[in-house]
């Protein structure tokens, strides 16, 4: 197929073609919607719903939009804009209820946080990329330092310097073009490219460095303009002050201010100025080439070193001649550092990408062409300067050998180099090009045009880069400077900031001091651009489809390494400073964690790494040395049982998997599920809990828990421990609920999961605080009031829901109720800690500190300080105490491992482990204790004491037995539900075990009543041998009136080993 006709669609021939649509032979007309559907779409029920209408005796067909809810593929459906069209959601097409709200994923996908400023002048590739790149490349070095580079490095190494610079720039341009053509590029230039490719940390860091480099480059070019202007004035006997440096500062400040005003006026004025400046520069370069070909016009020019093109001069100047110059012993890399800023204009088009009509096409085309032309021009000027001028010249005509008015020997004019008294020549004068030109004043105009045009381009790009950073809210300090003004959205505040930054470096008034500084900054930026392309091409996310094909992944990597190597070779100290600045800015953004999602390649790499790691982990055999408890926490919504989630986090913190299971008996719409997911994830992040939430809906507790147990996780990343709360209402709940709870334990054991049950005083369930209105992004409100009128916290408009999505920082005064932990009253009295006050505080007047503060929810539930403290029981710092472990039965070691993990956390570091174990033979007590101590030593578990329990078989006290009988009385009656009835036969059969549990209660009360946490082996509920109420009665007796209790039963595979 001919490529030219590749995208042309031929018309369909035939008589059955109407209105450009090929019609079949048979047309069936039928109603396309029911009356209900018509009403939903705003069509009257009695309106005609046929596919054809008769009007004025002719047929017309209804449009497709009237026949279907479906949306056709349109560009507007994919735009990241609030004004973009929105295709029908899946819920609308499927017929779900509650579909009026856009999916959160789609809202995040739309770039609402990075709005583009008001639309201004849009430029094509010539005006927007080609000319700005040429002007930026043809900068201060073109007329003021290129001849000096030739004098130091010689023609040969000068061409090498140009070649290395060209290679770096070409590779970077190819990399930049690949990124720019992988979708639409908005305003922000280099920052936008890198941030959307590698993420906000890299993009913002390089963006700040690049903006700073451009601001300093503007001052550097302004200094070049001032130097040239002052040389012209002084050559004519004019001066502003006695000090040339002050002249540079005065003229530079005025010039900088005028250029900022020109840029702030708008793109159209700046574009008109560029066209004028580019014409002057090209004319000055032609003037230099013509003058060099013509040769010296008089003997004074020969005496000043301009001898005309000759092979002898070319050969003499071909080799290098590095000397002490500019307060430094020059070498190849120091000269390279001075020259490199003259080729750093390749980003000029990308910097104003938001002002381009078609950035994806304009940036590659304009940049590469500008780079080609500028490198050719630099090469020609090096060849002409090196082939037509001497390195040293005295300027004295008397040093010339003149015969019959013709100079026959000019070698003597260079003898001044022996005593360093030469004032002219490539080494000593920056005005060589003016000397070699056909008309000298034109070179001054070209120099001014080159310097001012580059400064204009830099000054134009910096405010827009700052604006992009501010709009994205990466660095809060830049938000103030990003405000757009006028119909073109000009960042006037950014121009003011740019002016003062450039002015600060303008006051240095030394071009050669500034050039190496910005060379490192530009090289760092180019290195990141190349790394962006390499990383994206390496990861190859599905979204990586650049239309620019002339790039190579390994070439981009080579460009990255080359930039870093050149940075270190040019000035290693400044390179380290640049790296330090970059990583500081990187860490600031990383610490702030901006809420952005730009689909960067680091995210794609994260996904690929996680996937490959999960596959590799699945192929790796399990080993006891690598065991970690991976928890499935049946907490419902995490806000409802914060203490249970905190305990799970205490065990799995930053080391293993934790999944919070949420079971809902109602069938929830997608909208409600999404709102719950957002609310739960935000709550977990706010509480600094690393966990995943897994939700099932439309199931009762037992089948929902079974689904979570069997379906949670992937590969080896699957739960191996089920953590759940103790059912404190087991004596009053419906029989089905009690049986379901008990059956979940059997389900866990059937799937070979370990089980852990936690009980705390007052219970774990605070779901009454969390209302069911999660789809509105809010839960039951929690407010604090005081019994004293003076210390009131509740105010109108400050009722905050427990899991509200509202940003509390936007309310005044600031009450952080999002995690239900912290509340500060008007007297700065913090309730979150709930610690005991010392004696001095207790002695204060009751009116001062002993007010009773009560927390009220929307449902009227009151929470005391004690209840609030219980909600944060496993989160707050524990005072000195003990962590008692009753390791009664060998379950593989999990019962001893979990408390050891807890004791290693900083919040529980003050709690010492006390181990309680059962003795098998009373007459061998000492031997049993020695064996247990030896086992613990081999496991390398530190403990403060070891107690062997020897009277476990003693009968319980009568009052203990009476308490047990009272507990199970309801379930032994004839009227009890058959599923929850404890028969006399069961009591008799399990009498020995029951007495053992009752005896354990007495031992626990005697030894562990003051412990911070008690961890105990969970009795094994043998399937078919024990009923749910009797088993719960065992747990009730062993945990009532005791500190927080954690029952643990491992899956009887070893989780500890004493082998290395």
From Swiss-Prot:
Keyword vocabulary terms for this entry: Chloride, Glycoprotein, Ion transport, Membrane, Potassium, Potassium transport, Sodium, Sodium transport, Symport, Transmembrane, Transmembrane helix, Transport
Organism: Manduca sexta (Tobacco hawkmoth)
GO molecular function annotations of the record: sodium:potassium:chloride symporter activity
Entry GO CC: membrane
Physiological role: Electrically silent transporter system. Mediates sodium and chloride reabsorption. Plays a vital role in the regulation of ionic balance and cell volume.
This protein's name: Bumetanide-sensitive sodium-(potassium)-chloride cotransporter
UniProt-annotated glycosylation sites, renumbered to this chain: 396, 404, 419, 816
Source superkingdom: Eukaryota
Main location: membrane
UniProt keyword Cell membrane present: no
Spans traversing the lipid bilayer: 123-143, 154-174, 198-218, 250-270, 276-296, 332-352, 368-388, 432-452, 498-518, 563-583, 643-663, 882-902
A Pfam family reported for this protein in Swiss-Prot or TrEMBL: SLC12
